[in-house]
């Protein structure tokens, strides 16, 4: 009788162990191949974990190709990972994270006519550090944009009737920021009255320009025109 009880207990424990393994496999079916990055033996080295199953839509990169870029007088083959908010560069065919320094890292990409700066900026009530694209700049006025890519977790079908949804890197709308007289970098207001109040000496002229030119405070080209008008 005791032997029978022992056999039953061992069988049940084995079943629970196998079940937990299967549950673990199900949870890890859709794992990101890009977002989980490990640092290898070399500091800053990037290694990408491979996916076991499932599809992946989109990309964490604004441009997946490594493009010639200039940083502090040196030239690198680089690309920008907007999901991780990091630049990567090639070093003897190895992908390495570029170390960014606040206020000191400027990445210029002549081929794309783009310049990134690593800055401290205000986002609502919090402050963030990251790369912003410079759209317009004078000594007293600057316009930036933040490029964003979010990771959306996929859905694994539990039965043959369920629909599978792949993991996805989704490019979000760019967010625009301004800086006046070297002050805080903050979001561009999307309402005309709030925006014109930033420029008390020019508020009427700016308001007229926005209305007469049908300027959208959410559109990159419109904002560049507007800031060029203000900066004259």
PLM feature spans:
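Sec-dependent signal peptide cleavage junction
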Residues: 19-53
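A short, Trp-centered hydrophobic/proline-enriched beta-strand micro-motif
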Residues: 42-71
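Aromatic-patch recognition
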Residues: 60-187
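Long, compositionally biased interface segments
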Residues: 187, 196-232
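Acidic/His-leaning functional-site neighborhoods
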Residues: 190
């Amino acid at each position: 009788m005791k032997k029978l009880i022992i056999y039953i207990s061992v069988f049940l424990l084995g079943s629970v162990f196998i079940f937990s393994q299967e549950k673990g496999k199900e949870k890890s079916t859709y794992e990101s191949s890009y977002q989980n990055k490990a640092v290898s033996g070399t500091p800053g080295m990037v290694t990408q974990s491979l996916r076991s199953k499932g599809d992946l839509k989109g990309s964490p990169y604004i441009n997946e190709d490594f493009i010639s870029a200039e940083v502090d007088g040196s030239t690198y083959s680089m690309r920008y990972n907007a999901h991780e908010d990091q630049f990567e560069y090639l070093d003897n065919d190895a992908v390495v994270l570029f170390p960014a320094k606040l206020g000191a890292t400027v990445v210029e990409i002549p081929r794309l006519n783009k310049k990134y700066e690593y800055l401290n900026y205000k986002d609502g009530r919090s402050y963030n550090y990251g790369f912003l694209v410079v759209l317009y700049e004078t000594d007293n006025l600057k316009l930036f944009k933040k490029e964003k890519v979010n990771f959306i977790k996929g859905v694994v079908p539990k039965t043959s009737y369920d629909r599978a949804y792949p993991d996805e890197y989704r490019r979000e709308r760019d967010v625009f920021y301004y800086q006046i007289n070297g002050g805080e970098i903050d979001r561009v207001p999307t309402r005309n009255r709030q925006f014109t109040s930033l420029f008390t000496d020019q508020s009427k002229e700016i308001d007229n320009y926005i209305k007469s030119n049908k300027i959208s405070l959410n559109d990159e080209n419109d904002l560049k025109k507007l800031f060029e008008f203000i900066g004259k």
